[in-house]
Structures are given as C-alpha cells and as structure tokens.
C-alpha cells in the first residue's frame, strides 16, 4: 500500500515538473513584469538622454537665431517659416522616443499574451474546448 502511494506521489511530482519545465507553462510573476517595466523606463531615459546629446546644437541654433535679430525682424514671414521648419524638425526628433516607447510597450504586451498561449489564440480556443493543447493543465 505504501509503495503504491509512493509511486503515485512520484508520478504526480514528475507531471508537475514536466508542466513547469517549459517557459510557456509558467505564468508571469510580478517580479518579471516589474523588471520589464523598470527596464523599459531605463531604456526610455537612455533614449531621451541620447537624443539630447546628439542634437544639442538644434536647441542652441534656435536660441541664437532669435537673439541675433532685432524685434522688427522677428515678425518677418521668412523667420516664421524657418521656425515652422525647426518646429517640424523638433517634432520629428521627439517623436522617435515615443515611437520606440510604443514599440516596447507592444513588445511587453505581446510577451504577456504569448505567455498564455502555445499556438495562438485560435488554437488555444480549440485546445481548451477539446482538452488538447500545451497549456490546458491536464494530464
């Protein structure tokens, strides 16, 4: 009788290790998601610092141009066009980190989605309905 119980426990232990051995079989822990978020924040800071280091002359040129002209020339239409071009250039520069941030957030969300599936959403629905599939937790 004890041998049967021991064999049963050994079998359950073996199944438990097989289910948890695959990366997709394990759910995301809170520490994993917090580490990804902190990594995302550090990357955003690094990107913004790198953009500021690469293009400090752009900010200086705009200030220099405005200071060198007298107040009468500031209202000149040509200067207004130049400022529009500088503003457009600035918006392009500042849009890069936001685009990169959105890509990183998409990556973070896809990792969360991918952690619960093995073959995709449709196959998961089929697997859940039929009892087949890799993450159904059965047998």
From Swiss-Prot:
It is found in: Secreted. GO terms for biological process: blood vessel diameter maintenance; cGMP biosynthetic process; cGMP-mediated signaling; negative regulation of systemic arterial blood pressure; neuropeptide signaling pathway; receptor guanylyl cyclase signaling pathway. Its main location: secreted. Residues 1-21 form the signal peptide. PROSITE patterns: NATRIURETIC_PEPTIDE. Residues 22-114 form a propeptide. The keyword Cell division does not apply. GO terms for molecular function: hormone activity; hormone receptor binding. Disulfide bonds join 118-134. GO terms for cellular component: cytoplasm; extracellular space. Keywords: Cleavage on pair of basic residues, Disulfide bond, Hormone, Secreted, Signal, Vasoactive. Hormone playing a key role in cardiovascular homeostasis through regulation of natriuresis, diuresis, and vasodilation. Has a cGMP-stimulating activity. Belongs to the natriuretic peptide family. PANTHER family: ATRIAL NATRIURETIC FACTOR PRECURSOR, NATRIURETIC PEPTIDES B. This is Natriuretic peptides A.
